Each structure stands twice: as structure tokens, then as C-alpha cells.
């Protein structure tokens, strides 16, 4: 993988990991357009740039993370259902690794955002700070997050939708989603390395790995800060519309044969 491609994929990862638009869908698009082979080094590269994204969340929210034990307990409770469900259903997920599933979930998630925003129009939110989130609500968010195991759903999208349905205001829903990404992504990455320890031994081209890591970190920091400011003033409808448009783009690419709904998707 060349340095320029590493830079581009790092940007894609940083831009889409925490926006509710499906980072998986964008990585499919990016690797296909760039003509990158999905080999062992690519898998190692993906792990490294995801670590950059995780570090970005810690960097942005470090004050909240060190305010006390309460937030860590809530994140642990939130991760629990995702971890349990993931452990038991992971081996059955290959059946969902299909481009048409991505299409369906992109469009479905977009419609959900639009419907929820219309339903919440002029309504008062019940939860307006992280401190007000109950352990029961944190657990429910974890259940929603587990839906992101379905390709095209978006981890942040699923958990944010869960928060909105539970009465969180937009900013709190997004903040808890971002914070919940820390244990979720760290453990998911560790599990990937445990299953395929050779992935680290394949990471022998340090320059593209470093470029991807730093780029993903910097872009993710900027995106998180921008996103939180954006949703403090606006709603999620633009993201819903974007998801629907992207879903139809994928529909066209798969239907026309430009992309293979099976093999092209298996990242």
C-alpha cells in the first residue's frame, strides 16, 4: 500500500468512524475506487487506523473519563450486552456479509433518523447530561449498539438512535455513543488480534501504518468536535438523507455489476 493511499484511507476512517453513516460502507467504496487488494497487510492497516480513531475519542473526552468512576461503570454496563451478543452470534455473522445487507441497513438507518427527528419535533428531552443516564438506559444503548454487527448499520448510528429513542438530547446521545466506542473498539480490536495474531507480524511497512494512524487520529478529533457543535444547533436529518443517498449509490453499484455484492464486501 502506498503512502498516498494510506493517507486517503486514514481520512476516510477518521471522517466516518464516529459519524452515523457507516464507516464500513465508506471503506468498501474507498478500497474499491483505489483498487486496493484486501490482503493481510490491509487487515493490519485497518486495525492500526481504528486504534487512531479510538485514541481520538480518549483525547477529546479525557476530562469526562477522569471525572469519576460513574462514567466507567455506565460504559461497562453499556458494553456488556454488545460483548455478550457479539460472543454468541459472531460465528453466524458471515451470512450477513453481503452488499445487499449494506444497502438495506444504510437506507433503513437513514429513514429511522428522519422519522425520529420528526417524532421529537418540539418535544423536551428527558436526559440532558451524561450524569443523568441510568444504568438501565446504558444497558439498552448497548443492545442498540449490538445491531451494528449487521454490516451497513453504523455503530455510532445504532447507539445514537437508541439514545434518541430513550429521550437523550442529541449531544448526550452522541457523547455517550463516542465514549462507548472506547471499550467496544478496544476489545473488538484485541479479539481480532487474538484470532489472527499474524496480523501484527504483517504490519511491517511502518511508514504507511504511521501515516494512516496519525491521519485517522487527527481527522477523527476534528470530526468529533465539529459533529458535537453541529448537532447542538441542528438535527440528524441531513445524516439520514445522506445515508439514504449512499444506500441507493450502493444499490446502483451492485445492481449494475460494478461491485460484487458478495466478494467485494468481505473486508
Curated annotation (Swiss-Prot):
Topology with respect to the bilayer: Multi-pass membrane protein
Gene Ontology process terms (BP): cell wall organization; peptidoglycan biosynthetic process; regulation of cell shape; response to antibiotic
Species of provenance: Campylobacter jejuni subsp. doylei (strain ATCC BAA-1458 / RM4099 / 269.97)
Keyword set, alphabetical order: Antibiotic resistance, Cell inner membrane, Cell membrane, Cell shape, Cell wall biogenesis/degradation, Hydrolase, Membrane, Peptidoglycan synthesis, Transmembrane, Transmembrane helix
Top EC group: hydrolase
UniProt entry tagged with the keyword Hydrolase: yes
Function as written in the Swiss-Prot or TrEMBL entry: Catalyzes the dephosphorylation of undecaprenyl diphosphate (UPP). Confers resistance to bacitracin.
NCBIfam families linked to this entry: PRK00281.1-4 (NF001390), undec_PP_bacA (TIGR00753)
HAMAP family: Undec_diphosphatase (MF_01006)
Catalytic activity: di-trans,octa-cis-undecaprenyl diphosphate + H2O = di-trans,octa-cis-undecaprenyl phosphate + phosphate + H(+)
InterPro entries: UppP
Regions crossing the membrane: 1-21, 41-61, 69-89, 96-116, 173-193, 207-227, 239-259
Family to which this protein belongs: Belongs to the UppP family.
Misc note: Bacitracin is thought to be involved in the inhibition of peptidoglycan synthesis by sequestering undecaprenyl diphosphate, thereby reducing the pool of lipid carrier available.
Gene Ontology cellular-component terms listed: plasma membrane
Superkingdom to which the source organism belongs: Bacteria
Protein name in UniProt: Undecaprenyl-diphosphatase
